[in-house]
């Protein structure tokens, strides 16, 4: 992209006890600096809602170490990185023969079959059911024998060959050949009670961030799976109103463990799929949790195959400051799995919880005798440590006052990782490689490729890491490039969004400022979306866009076209975000500051940030607002209920209001248990309802979906009740049958239109 990005340097303002150091900031408003002479259109609310200006992605799926699949004009093409050419893998006309609208596809690892997904029906955040057909690529025809049942919950190819494992009605089945009958692996599945090979609600949302609980061994011989038992888990119930012709609303019931309630139990099994027989039932071998876990409630939180016959399991206590990794080997003579205590690796936290959200996954060397893992070092920063399976101690191979975000690939010579080391900016992401024979030899592969445009990268490696796709997300327009890891040479630009860049030349775009303030000798980063032709001598209304949950990050170098773009471009509102105590990727001291005390420091810091912004000279301190969604809705409500006098108004969407109402895994990670012996007092002292009286001083808009399975409508209902009880005049909006995302087309347009009207009224804008 050839956009003449500008750099804003200099001090925008000064504040008492605050140091402001300005870093390079990409300005998106191109052209004249004279607002009166700029006749270009602004980025409007309609532009956001209708997605007028679309960011182009480049999605690929690696199928070998040098080939990937991608879609173009609805054809599936295969690109050969070695020769630099593309060919048609499957024509769009082929899909027309199926008689169904194909939602997704998946190629078997041996390239012989393609799995076609249709009749997609969403369930929760990750889960869904669908129908599947298998297409034989050699015979160029659908397989009609022994088809996978409709309403299948999950399906996955083995890593090699073309075995299939799938879950239907909460039970697991395996196909050795796509056209042959399935082997049934489990017989205990029961809706909302026993889940085999798939997660229940809380494991899906808070532990695995996935619906699948199946793990193939690398050669496809063994299939590991988890079983979750929700028999004793309490149900959340809510009405689903559906079509207006429905005389009685449906009642949705979901096993949902709230803080302190009965949790699901978990068991883990492995089955040998090479020994399946149509005569006898499959034999699944259980691997039990370590004795240190069995003494109380615990979670299975990670499963990783080390070799064909070695598997690692990570277990976590319900109080999530203690985890154990078991490394288990297959004993062919007995058919059992042996997990030696001598190979257990314990991870603990004395200041908070283990991991960012859960313990990180291990990355094993080829022989399975050692692995690399991200853990906190003595200084409280998350870095890569090298473990040998028979030794307790590990060797850190990275260090510094920055953090490794993730390990991306491991070869015999190098380890590749993403970190935020570059220029000391926590909101940046770059790709590095470290030489395994000499840990002092570290190379940043992305830092200097296009530093003005690209400071936030993610990566996708080919099967053996010979090639990789770099995905730049900002601060400029997204850029996708292909590289060879042999010499780290850039091979080609896959997508540069040049068409969008040309369109945006004709739009008055806002600018983005990324900076930090120093409070109590600690850096806290913030970002500001500034109106076009920003003039620091003028006064602007300011909207604080907040999330502020544990390990969150709002101040980053990502390019976005969103609601804030409209507010800044068209309404001349500054939209700011601030990462205070509790935020992530800056060390445990900051992140663990809110351990066992949600609703305190992260709330206070948003108020203090607004105070400091108002001292910068260009903020109208009589027109400061705050808004947030989910945890951000909670913080917004706690801020407005603080009686600080800083904010005129605010919007809370789907907020938590009392932590005893939220799920056990998330809440207890940060708060412990709501018992007198543990942390009940703070549970009770951190509610929005206890601050109801102070809402008389502000304008408040409360929004929630009635079918929110995550943060239940109950949470907003209790806020509403408390405000009514003390006579607070406030606004409220509910969205019928909408879940936590309020994402249906009509609801999405309505909520952002409604919030825009509220903010404009609050700021006295026309």
UniProtKB/Swiss-Prot annotation:
Keywords: Aminopeptidase, Cell adhesion, Cell junction, Cell membrane, Cell projection, Disulfide bond, Glycoprotein, Host-virus interaction, Hydrolase, Membrane, Protease, Receptor, Secreted, Serine protease, Signal-anchor, Transmembrane, Transmembrane helix
Protein name: Dipeptidyl peptidase 4
Effect caused by changing residue 229 to A: Does not inhibit dipeptidyl peptidase activity, interaction with ADA and homodimer formation
Topological type in the membrane: Single-pass type II membrane protein
Organism per entry: Homo sapiens (Human)
PANTHER family, per the entry: DIPEPTIDYL PEPTIDASE 4, PROTEASE FAMILY S9B,C DIPEPTIDYL-PEPTIDASE IV-RELATED
Mutagenesis / variant outcome for changing residue 150 to A: Does not inhibit dipeptidyl peptidase activity, interaction with ADA and homodimer formation
Regulation: Inhibited by GPC3 and diprotin A.
Consequence of substituting residue 750 to A: Inhibits weakly homodimerization and dipeptidyl peptidase activity
GO biological process: behavioral fear response; cell adhesion; endothelial cell migration; glucagon processing; locomotory exploration behavior; membrane fusion; negative regulation of extracellular matrix disassembly; negative regulation of neutrophil chemotaxis
EC top class, as a word: hydrolase
Keyword match Glycoprotein: yes
Pfam family, one: DPPIV_N
Induction comment: Up-regulated by IL12/interleukin-12 on activated T-cells. IL12-activated cells expressed enhanced levels of DPP4 but not mRNAs. Down-regulated by TNF. Up-regulated in migratory endothelial cells and in the invasive endothelial cells in tumors. Induced by hypoxia.
Cellular localization per UniProt: Cell membrane; Apical cell membrane; Cell projection, Invadopodium membrane; Cell projection, Lamellipodium membrane
Other comment: Level of plasma concentrations of the soluble form (SDPP) can be managed as a colon carcinoma diagnostic and prognostic marker.
Primary location class: membrane
Cytoplasmic domain ranges by topology: 1-6
Domain-related comment: The extracellular cysteine-rich region is necessary for association with collagen, dimer formation and optimal dipeptidyl peptidase activity.
Phenotype upon changing residue 92 to A: Does not inhibit dipeptidyl peptidase activity, interaction with ADA and homodimer formation
SS bond partners: 328-339, 385-394, 444-447, 454-472, 649-762
Lineage: Eukaryota, Metazoa, Chordata, Craniata, Vertebrata
Gene Ontology MF term list: aminopeptidase activity; chemorepellent activity; dipeptidyl-peptidase activity; identical protein binding; protease binding; protein homodimerization activity; serine-type endopeptidase activity; serine-type peptidase activity
């Amino acid at each position: 992209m050839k956009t003449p990005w500008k750099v804003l340097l200099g001090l925008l303002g000064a504040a008492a006890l605050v140091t402001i150091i300005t870093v390079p900031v990409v300005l998106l408003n191109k052209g004249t600096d004279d607002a009166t002479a700029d006749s270009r259109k602004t980025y409007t609310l309609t532009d956001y809602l209708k997605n007028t200006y679309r960011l182009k992605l480049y999605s690929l799926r690696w199928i070998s170490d040098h080939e990937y699949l991608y879609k173009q004009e609805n054809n599936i093409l295969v690109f050969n990185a070695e020769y630099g050419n593309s060919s048609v893998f499957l024509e769009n006309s082929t899909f027309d023969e199926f008689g169904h609208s194909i939602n997704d596809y998946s190629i078997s690892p041996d390239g012989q079959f393609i799995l076609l997904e249709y009749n997609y029906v969403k369930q929760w955040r990750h889960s869904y059911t669908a129908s599947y057909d298998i297409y034989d690529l050699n015979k160029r025809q659908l397989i009609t024998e022994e088809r996978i049942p409709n309403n299948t919950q999950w399906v996955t190819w083995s890593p090699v060959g073309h075995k299939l494992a799938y879950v239907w009605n909460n039970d697991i089945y395996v196909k050795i050949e796509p056209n042959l009958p399935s082997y049934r692996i489990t017989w205990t599945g029961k809706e909302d009670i026993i889940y085999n090979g798939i997660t229940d609600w809380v494991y899906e949302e808070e532990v695995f961030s996935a619906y699948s609980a199946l793990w193939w061994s690398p050669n496809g011989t063994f299939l590991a799976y988890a079983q979750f038992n929700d028999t004793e888990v309490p149900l959340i119930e809510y009405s689903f109103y559906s079509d207006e012709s429905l005389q009685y609303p449906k009642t949705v019931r979901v096993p949902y463990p709230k803080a302190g309630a009965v949790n699901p139990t978990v068991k883990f099994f492995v089955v040998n799929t090479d020994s399946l027989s149509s005569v006898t039932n499959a034999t699944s071998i259980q691997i039990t949790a370590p004795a240190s876990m069995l003494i109380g409630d615990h979670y299975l939180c990670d499963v990783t195959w080390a070799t064909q016959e070695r598997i690692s399991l990570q277990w976590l206590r319900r109080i999530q400051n203690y985890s154990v990794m078991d490394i288990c080997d297959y004993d062919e003579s007995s058919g059992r799995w042996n997990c030696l205590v001598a190979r257990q690796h314990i991870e603990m936290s004395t200041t908070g919880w283990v991991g960012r959200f859960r313990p990180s996954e291990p990355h094993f060397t080829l022989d399975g005798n050692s692995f690399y893992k991200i853990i906190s070092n003595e200084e409280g920063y998350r870095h890569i440590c090298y473990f040998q399976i028979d030794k307790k101690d590990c060797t850190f191979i990275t260090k510094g006052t920055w953090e490794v975000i993730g390990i991306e690939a491991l070869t015999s010579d190098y380890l590749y990782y993403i970190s935020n080391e570059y220029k000391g900016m926590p909101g940046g992401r770059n790709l590095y490689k470290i030489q395994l024979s000499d840990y002092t030899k570290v190379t940043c592969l992305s830092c200097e490729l296009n530093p003005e445009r690209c400071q936030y990268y993610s990566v996708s490696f080919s099967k053996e890491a010979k090639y990789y796709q770099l995905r730049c997300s900002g601060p400029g327009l997204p850029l996708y490039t292909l590289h060879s890891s042999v010499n780290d040479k850039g091979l080609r630009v896959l997508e540069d969004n040049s068409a969008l860049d040309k369109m945006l030349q004709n739009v008055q775009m806002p600018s983005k400022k990324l900076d930090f303030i120093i409070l109590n000798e600690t850096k806290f980063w913030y970002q500001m979306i500034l109106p076009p032709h920003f003039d620091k001598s003028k006064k602007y209304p300011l909207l604080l866009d907040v999330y502020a949950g544990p390990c969150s990050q709002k101040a980053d170098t990502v390019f976005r076209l969103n609601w804030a773009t409209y507010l800044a471009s068209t309404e001349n509102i500054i939209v700011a975000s601030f990462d205070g105590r509790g935020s992530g990727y800056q060390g445990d001291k900051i992140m663990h500051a809110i351990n066992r005390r949600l609703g305190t420091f992260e709330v206070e810091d948003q108020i203090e940030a607004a105070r400091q912004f108002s001292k910068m000279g260009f903020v109208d301190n009589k027109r400061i607002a705050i808004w947030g969604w989910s945890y951000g809705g909670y913080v917004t409500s706690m801020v407005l209920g603080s009686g600080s006098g800083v904010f005129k108004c605010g919007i809370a969407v789907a907020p938590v209001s009392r932590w005893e109402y939220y799920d056990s895994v998330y809440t207890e990670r940060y708060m412990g248990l709501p018992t007198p012996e543990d942390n009940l007092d703070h549970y009770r002292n951190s509610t929005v309802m206890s601050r109801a009286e102070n809402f008389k001083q502000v304008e408040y808009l409360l929004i929630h979906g009635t079918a929110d399975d995550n943060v239940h409508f109950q949470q907003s209902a209790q806020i509403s009740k408390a405000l009514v009880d003390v006579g607070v005049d406030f606004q409220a909006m509910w969205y019928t049958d909408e879940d936590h995302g309020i994402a249906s087309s009509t609801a999405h347009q309505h909520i952002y239109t409604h919030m825009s009207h509220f903010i404009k009224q609050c700021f006295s804008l026309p």
